[in-house]
Amino acid sequence: MIDVLKPPPSSGLIREVRFFLEFPRLMLRFPDLARQPRGRGEPILILPGYGAGDGSTIVLKSYLRLLGYRARGWGLGRNSGNVRDLLPRVLKKMASFARRAQQEVHLIGWSLGGYLAREVARERPDLVRQVITLGTPVVGGPKYTVVARAFHRQGIDVDAIEAEIELRNQISFHTPVTAIYSRKDAVVSWEACIDRDAANVEHIEVRTTHLGFGFSPEVYKIIAKRLAVEADSLRHGLASNSPQRREATPTRRRH
């Protein structure tokens, strides 16, 4: 399967400017979004994508706070893409957040931030309630993204990164994951966002660009509903992977 994957063509990047269209859509849909189920201070940590920082997720964070969640950015500056350096730092941040909140943390990760969120859940499933990823490549790392060419020019071995990720993916984890992806994504190959092995992953397709994930009203509504399901399960004392919780989760959308 991996052999047939390719990064999106550079010519498609012009489509990413359409993410500006998400702002008027967000305003038009805001009355409906504001009526989504409310949280009760449940902790949410939002991880930005490669090259981005907390400023890129400020709109999403503000929306989740409006709904009553304790949402915060990761506080680690710009995402350098150095997973080996970032993962222990994110783990420390998340563990501290969970300890102060005295409950499991919901993780939302955009692109590479989603990969980090999955790895945090793999390392500390006891502290993570759920993971929501936005346009996150789960196979190949940067290999099936438009930044692959830049990595090649820098002498970075993307094949070695892919092999390392394959090994990591063999370590199973049971934290529920909602993987939101788009065939209109011109940065990450949408096929690379599909986890074909893990039973704990639900894939949901949306119509937005890669840059639009953080501002799409469709994405916001999905996130709000997923948070509500897990928050309600927690209030009723259900484990995140319990049969009752799975029954309450909306049917997965086929890809």
Tell me what each language-model feature is.
Residues 173-186, 206-208:
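Conserved strand-to-loop "acid loop" that flanks and positions the catalytic carboxylate
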Residues 186-192:
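Conserved alpha/beta-hydrolase "acid-adjacent" motif
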Residues 87, 215-227:
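Post-His helix in hydrolase/transferase enzymes
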Residues 1-44, 57, 62, 67, ...:
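Flexible, membrane-associating and regulatory peripheral segments of lipid-active enzymes
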